[in-house]
């Protein structure tokens, strides 16, 4: 049975589907819970722990179906939850050599990886490069905090720097998807700070294509002419 230190796990279960920011956050976590519970003895990797809000939900799902959860954080979060299925490793989640040395069973294939650690474009890109090859066919890669909208001007969490970083991560997720479109499905769950979920269709052994930015078009002669005529 999962025990949590900083919050009541049952409150997350109860809030799923409810209005408000916490309801949206709970719904996103319970979406991951549902997917884990659809598997038999899944292996789950969590990048970023903090107070264990996602850790408790993921561990509960793993306990129900005989799975295992490995959580990574540079801060000592070893006491945020207790669960027989949980392994915590205090490390940078891009130190793959150490992670695989301490949790070698991850080499068998990861069913779901939840990315919610250092929010920087370079770091998330590196996480994708390192861990995507270990995700099993039909497995999932979930990215928390991908929607820049809550940080935009006039929004509840108005913050220029966070808006810029979150938008870069949003774009990276799309760039990675379109570079590997034949091998992935992608869906978004908006609300709170947003979550993106990719499902991997390719065999575990297949390496991904490098993400490439598709340049957008912002103006054309036709749209410019319409503006000059006073039309939208």
Go through each PLM region and give its residues.
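A short alpha-helical cap/connector motif
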Residues: 1-114, 118-232
